[in-house]
């Protein structure tokens, strides 16, 4: 025993000595490669001192002898002063150990290398000459010496040098012949000196000196390649590298690329010998081989013997599968296990050694930490062996790996061990009994951070999502292993039956921790578990409500949004709305529902009759609204709550949509549902609780500082409503239980949604897209599908134009706001209190308000938004009431600019606030409460009391009633306005005469139009879909869809009709808005000018044009309804899309209604004038046929025929001027209506044949004189005509220069005698007068039709002569 111990000690000492020698060699070569001469000399000197004490280190001496030529020739020759400067080098140089070698080197160095180089040159020339003549080589230096080996052993240094050079020159010639294939590869060169090991000591000195002194005639690369053909190439290449560190890369490159010349095995031996120089060489060679993807066995051998980083190399192979596929394929070959098995044995030995050390040294924390990391890395490699390399682990490796699971120091790596259990093939068959495997899994549940991971894996097993298990293992290991399906199923069976049953999983998920500030950077498993359980409906199966957990996690989230949160909320909505599991006891379910329905019937029977009547009224509303196209504005009265009527088959139910009010029947149903939902014996399907409105609002208020929570809450609400709409749409005609419909399928009402900060959330996610990347697409879809009014393209374009406007950068910033604002605010900015006080003094201090508005306009939208409510409440009423004052009128433009900037950010709240202000303003006595306004009126109106008395005397009862009806003082809600957008037209009349304010009104109108349309569509989808599925029920659903479409069209057409009426607010005396305006603005009757009205017309026509483009069908509906003919010049001129009317004018001409035919002809005449194209000519010919048919047939009565002629004569003159080709046919039609048409035709032919045509001077003078006389009598009536509604096509220019010849032709026309009463007719036909003015100011039935026909023919002919 003592002897064996001594032997072990000796062996250990030898191993230590070998390791120290290797380390010393590494230090020397690394110092040479790095050029660190100080460290090199220091190390050699230390080694020299050690050698003096121990003379047995011959290996060290030999290794150092290799580097001596480099030190003496390569270093000292270049820097001779280094010997005197460096003490370490001086000691080394004068050391007795190296004195002989140094002396020999100096002798070789002292040779005359000029003669040596000439010798080389001569020998090369001789060999080339002999090779050329193919003679035996008898003239070389080596051939002429007898017994050359004796000469080498006993000769002087020059002879030895020449002999070695002769040997090298011959070797170079042999190498060239081998490369050129002039000799066989099997031919060997027998080098007498350089390939003889006994001469290596001398070669150690000669070879480096040849490389330093003789490279002029010997190529270094060729020399390196030729050495590889020798038997001791390993040693000579090593010698070259030791003395030529600068050529390291080139030498390695030559060796690796010479496989084809010298063979694979020889290259391996050379490279292994080079690896002995240092670890740097071995790492470099391995890197080169891996990059070239060659010699995989050598790569593994270098790793195990020299580099010794097996774990890192194999990890790289497993992780980078594509790049290291060649290595993977080599390892997977069963016949190549010899090299790889060494690495496996090394890994197994490492695990055994660590296991023993842990057992003996359990208290050494530093070693334990290192050991735990090594074990974790090896276990990860074992997962890769079985999963990627196809290597089945043996029982010893499995056992030693599992033995670390229960070690306390490995608790942080429990996930790696879990992956090992899942990946290891044949694990269940290897471990007996199975209870041990169950124990390992239970231990992983209790220790470490593997509990939630095991729960998630068990969920995947329960839901048969094996691919997700592989993905989970990939995320833990860093690579995707190929898991054996059979082995994985065996583990899954144990996990799901012994540890995590399905019911336990459902209950355990409720207890999962809620992560604070959950975002996408958290690798949280809880949300993944809940998501998969929701998607597979396991919670529903075991009646587990996880809604509270989801809502709590939602309120704890932050940015960037976790990628699973939107999907989690989607699944939660689906589980709340669409339960899929029903109990078999359907009879008990039916009885409970019948009981609930009976209890609720008592509270709803009384309202059913009223609801039925309301439904009938709603059905006929479209017809009533269609008939009312002009004149009045209809609306609804605002109320605190909105009543929603829904119809289910033949039954009708009424429910209050206010979130705080619930009917008695519904409360009974809710209590019944809550009392029976938890009982499995009740037979009711399980439902998760719907999140109430109060919880949602409280969460939003509590998360004012966390916008991500608000966005997620709004996303949930919108997703819930969207799911309800889709579910009810899919269930159309299918039976739905009444209890389900009244509890689960209750969408959040529109009034509640209007209070949510949806618009702000849109701005937030669009400005921070990276933080909300996973929620942006579904969130924008939900908003677009439910609130399309928030995506107004016009507002976006205006905002973009404003941002790109360079003039905005030069806005003057006054100092007023900072001086006055600083009095009330320490920060120097404006507060709402200061702004409110200043706005109250607007009439007395308009300049202050002007400066403040200019300052506010320089703020960003985010900074400007808090002042919006103050501006609207205090400034807008003053602007409306005192718009005629120049000081107030100047404030409109900056106010509107601010309004337009903040409106896209908060459309719903700003629109509602603005409309409530505009509809609640009362001009009578509201201004008396304002002290500043009262002072202003007293200073500027001395007779204010007298004016008020006169105004009161002029008011009558009818006007007071109209004021009460049209301007109610109320507070409209969002639901009120979207139910009837016409409420917007109840705004103060000042808005309709002020272009900036009217522009605001149009934006609000568009917002509520889109909202109303979407609300009607949603009501259609969310209306009760229960029923028996009969044909009559399907027909009823189709009828409801048609009714909603008709209602939307009718609503939009009514809005267009009212807007068109506004265009004539100063043109005609209507009973509509013009009358309202005049009644309400008696104080400021001339408060607007035609320029404002023209601008408003342009705004209206642009708005209508956009509606026509969005829905071309509406243009047909509006024109089939018809409007005043005075609007045609305005619509045709200012609405570019009016050309669409060409498509349906023929259909309009074919209508049986005479009014529609007249309107079609009038519309066609204006369109033809603007669009003189072939298509309009074709339609004009069709209208000509219709006119001829109406006038020449007996279809019309005499009165209708006269009415028809009076209406279309101006249009005929307009058409004939546009298309002269139709003039003759139209003149013929008109002449057919004259009693003396034959005589008229004869005179007309001679009249047309004349070259110049002028009217008779007598007739001209006569008519002009009468016109002047009548113009005085009818001054008021003629001046009221709007010049914008006239058309120059009808103007008659009577020339004063009359040709006598033409006068004779004109006198021959036999006109009917004109009475004095009818002479006024001719007075109207003069310059700048038209048929339209004649028609307006004269009763057409009092004018003989023959006179009008005569005049029309004159106009046609006049137009032809131009």
Swiss-Prot record:
Its main location: nucleus. InterPro entries: Int2_metazoa, INTS2. The gene is ints2. Keywords: Cytoplasm, Nucleus. Belongs to the Integrator subunit 2 family. Residues 1-20, 629-660, 928-963 are annotated as: Disordered. It comes from Dictyostelium discoideum (Social amoeba). This is Integrator complex subunit 2 homolog. Component of the Integrator complex. The core complex associates with protein phosphatase 2A subunits, to form the Integrator-PP2A (INTAC) complex. Component of the integrator complex, a multiprotein complex that terminates RNA polymerase II (Pol II) transcription in the promoter-proximal region of genes. Residues 945-955 have a biased composition (Basic and acidic residues). Residues 1-10 have a biased composition (Low complexity). Disulfide bonds: none annotated. It comes from the Eukaryota. Pfam families: INTS2. It is found in: Nucleus; Cytoplasm. One of its GO terms (biological process) is RNA polymerase II transcription initiation surveillance. One of its GO terms (cellular component) is integrator complex.
């Amino acid at each position: 025993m003592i002897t064996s111990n001594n032997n072990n000690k000796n062996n250990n000492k030898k191993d230590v000595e070998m390791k120290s020698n290797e380390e010393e060699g590494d230090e020397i070569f690394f110092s040479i490669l790095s050029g660190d001469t100080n460290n090199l000399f220091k190390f050699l000197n230390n080694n020299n001192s050690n050698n003096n004490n121990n003379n047995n280190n011959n290996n060290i001496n030999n290794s150092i002898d290799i580097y001596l030529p480099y030190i003496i020739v390569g270093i000292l020759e270049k820097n001779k002063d280094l010997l005197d400067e460096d003490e370490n080098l001086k000691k080394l140089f004068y050391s007795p150990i190296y004195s002989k070698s140094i002396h020999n080197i100096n002798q070789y160095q002292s040779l005359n290398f000029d003669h040596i180089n000439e010798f080389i040159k001569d020998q090369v020339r001789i060999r080339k000459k002999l090779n050329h003549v193919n003679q035996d080589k008898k003239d070389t230096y080596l051939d002429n010496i007898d017994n050359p080996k004796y000469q080498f052993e006993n000769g002087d240094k020059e002879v030895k040098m020449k002999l070695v050079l002769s040997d090298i020159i011959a070797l170079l010639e042999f190498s060239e012949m081998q490369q050129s294939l002039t000799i066989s590869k099997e031919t060997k060169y027998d080098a007498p000196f350089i390939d003889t090991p006994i001469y290596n000591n001398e070669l150690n000195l000669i070879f480096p000196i040849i490389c330093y002194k003789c490279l002029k005639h010997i190529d270094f690369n060729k020399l390196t390649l030729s050495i590889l053909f020798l038997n001791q190439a390993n040693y000579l290449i090593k010698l070259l590298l030791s003395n030529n560190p600068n050529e390291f890369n080139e030498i390695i490159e030559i060796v690796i690329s010479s496989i084809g010349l010298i063979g694979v095995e020889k290259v391996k031996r050379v490279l292994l010998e080079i690896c002995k120089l240092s670890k740097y060489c071995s790492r470099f060679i391995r890197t080169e081989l891996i990059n070239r993807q060659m010699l995989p066995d050598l790569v593994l051998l270098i790793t195990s013997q020299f580099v010794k980083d097996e774990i890192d190399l194999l990890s790289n192979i497993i992780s980078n599968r594509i790049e290291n596929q060649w290595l993977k394929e080599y390892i997977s070959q069963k016949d190549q296990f010899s090299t790889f098995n060494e690495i496996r044995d090394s890994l197994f030995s490492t695990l055994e050694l660590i296991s023993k050390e842990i057992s003996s040294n359990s208290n050494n924390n530093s070693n334990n930490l290192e050991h735990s990391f090594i074990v974790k890395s090896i276990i990860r490699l074992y997962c890769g062996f079985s999963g990627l390399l196809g290597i089945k682990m043996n029982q010893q490796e499995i056992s030693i790996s599992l033995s670390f699971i229960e070690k306390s120091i490995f608790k942080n790596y429990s996930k790696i061990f879990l992956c090992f259990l899942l990946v290891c093939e044949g694990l269940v068959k290897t471990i007996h009994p199975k209870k041990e495997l169950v124990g390992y899994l239970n231990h992983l549940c209790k220790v470490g951070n593997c509990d939630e991971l095991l729960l998630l894996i068990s969920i995947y097993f329960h839901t048969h999502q094996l691919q997700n298990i592989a993905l989970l293992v990939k995320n833990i290991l860093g690579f995707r292993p190929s898991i054996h399906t059979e082995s994985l199923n065996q583990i899954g069976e144990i996990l799901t039956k012994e540890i995590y049953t399905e019911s336990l999983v459902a209950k355990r998920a409720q207890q999962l921790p809620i992560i604070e500030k959950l975002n996408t950077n958290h690798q949280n498993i809880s949300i993944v578990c809940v998501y998969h359980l929701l998607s597979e409906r396991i919670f529903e199966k075991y009646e587990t409500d996880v809604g509270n957990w989801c809502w709590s996690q939602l309120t704890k989230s932050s940015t960037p949004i976790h990628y699973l949160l939107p999907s989690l909320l989607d699944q939660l909505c689906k589980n709340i709305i669409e339960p899929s599991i029903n109990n078999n006891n359907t009879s008990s379910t039916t009885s409970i529902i019948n009981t609930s329905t009976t209890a609720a019937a008592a509270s709803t029977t009384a309202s059913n009759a009223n609801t039925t009547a309301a439904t009938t009224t709603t059905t006929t509303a479209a017809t009533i609204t269609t008939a009312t196209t002009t004149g009045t504005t209809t609306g609804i009265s605002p109320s605190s709550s909105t009543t929603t009527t829904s119809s289910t088959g033949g039954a009708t139910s009424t429910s209050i949509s206010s979130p705080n009010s619930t009917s008695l029947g519904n409360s009974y149903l809710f209590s019944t549902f809550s009392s029976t939902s938890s009982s499995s014996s009740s037979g009711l399907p399980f439902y998760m609780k719907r999140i109430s409105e109060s919880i949602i609002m409280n969460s939003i208020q509590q998360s004012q500082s966390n916008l991500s929570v608000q966005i997620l809450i709004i996303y949930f609400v919108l997703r819930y409503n969207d799911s309800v709409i889709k579910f009810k749409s899919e269930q159309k005609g299918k039976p739905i239980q009444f209890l389900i419909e009244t509890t689960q399928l209750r969408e959040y009402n529109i009034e509640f949604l209007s209070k949510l900060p949806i618009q702000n959330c849109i701005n937030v996610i669009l400005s921070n897209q990276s933080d909300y990347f996973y929620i942006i697409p579904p969130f924008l879809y939900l908003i677009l599908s439910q609130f399309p009014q928030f995506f107004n393209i016009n507002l976006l374009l205006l905002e973009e134009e404003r941002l790109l406007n360079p003039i905005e950068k030069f806005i003057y910033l006054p100092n007023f706001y900072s001086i006055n604002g600083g009095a009330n605010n320490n920060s120097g900015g404006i507060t709402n209190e200061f702004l409110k006080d200043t706005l109250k003094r607007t009439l007395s201090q308009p300049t202050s308000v002007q400066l403040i508005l200019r300052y506010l306009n320089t703020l960003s939208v985010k900074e400007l938004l808090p002042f919006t409510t103050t501006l609207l409440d205090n400034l807008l009423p003053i602007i409306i009431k005192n718009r005629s004052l120049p000081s107030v009128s100047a404030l409109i433009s900056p106010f509107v600019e601010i309004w337009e900037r903040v409106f896209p950010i908060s459309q719903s709240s700003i629109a509602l606030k603005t409309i409530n202000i505009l509809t609640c303003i009362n001009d009578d006595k509201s201004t008396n409460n304002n002290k500043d306004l009262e002072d202003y009126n007293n200073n500027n109106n001395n007779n204010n009391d007298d004016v008020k008395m006169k105004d009161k005397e002029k008011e009558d009862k009818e006007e007071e009633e109209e004021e009460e009806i049209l301007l109610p003082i109320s507070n409209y809600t969002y639901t009120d306005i979207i139910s009837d957008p016409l409420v917007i037209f109840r705004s103060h009349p000042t808005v309709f005469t002020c272009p900036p304010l009217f522009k605001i009104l149009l934006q609000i109108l568009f917002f509520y139009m889109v909202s109303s349309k979407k609300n009607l569509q949603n009501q259609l989808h969310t209306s009760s879909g229960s029923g028996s599925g009969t044909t009559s029920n399907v027909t009823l659903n189709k009828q409801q869809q048609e009714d909603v479409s008709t209602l939307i069209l009718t609503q939009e057409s009514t809005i267009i009709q009212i807007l068109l009426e506004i265009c004539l607010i100063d043109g005609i005396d209507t009973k509509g808005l013009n009358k309202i305006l005049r009644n309400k603005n008696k104080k400021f009757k001339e408060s607007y000018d035609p320029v404002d009205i023209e601008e408003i017309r342009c705004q209206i026509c642009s708005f209508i044009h956009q509606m026509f483009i969005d829905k071309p069908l509406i243009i047909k509906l509006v024109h089939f309804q018809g409007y005043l003919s005075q609007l045609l010049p305005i619509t045709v001129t200012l609405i570019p899309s009016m050309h669409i009317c060409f498509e349906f004018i023929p259909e309009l001409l074919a209508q049986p209604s005479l009014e529609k035919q007249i309107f079609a002809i009038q519309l066609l005449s204006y369109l033809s004038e603007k669009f003189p194209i072939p298509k309009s000519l074709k339609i004009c010919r069709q209208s000509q046929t219709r006119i001829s048919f109406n006038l020449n047939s007996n279809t019309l009565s005499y009165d209708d025929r006269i009415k028809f002629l009076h209406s279309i004569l101006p249009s005929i003159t307009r058409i004939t001027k546009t298309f002269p080709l139709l003039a003759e046919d139209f003149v013929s039609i008109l002449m057919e209506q004259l009693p003396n048409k034959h005589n008229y035709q004869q005179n007309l032919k001679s009249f047309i044949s004349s070259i110049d045509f002028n009217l008779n001077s007598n007739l001209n003078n006569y008519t002009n004189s009468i016109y002047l006389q009548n113009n005085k009598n009818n001054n008021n009536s003629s001046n009221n005509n709007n010049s914008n509604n006239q058309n120059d096509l009808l103007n008659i220019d009577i020339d004063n220069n009359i040709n006598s010849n033409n006068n004779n032709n004109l006198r021959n026309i036999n006109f009917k005698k004109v009475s004095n009463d009818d002479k006024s007719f001719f007075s109207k036909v003069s310059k700048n007068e038209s048929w339209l003015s004649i028609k307006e100011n004269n009763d057409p039935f009092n004018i003989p039709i023959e006179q009008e026909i005569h005049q029309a023919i004159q106009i046609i002919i006049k137009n032809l002569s131009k």
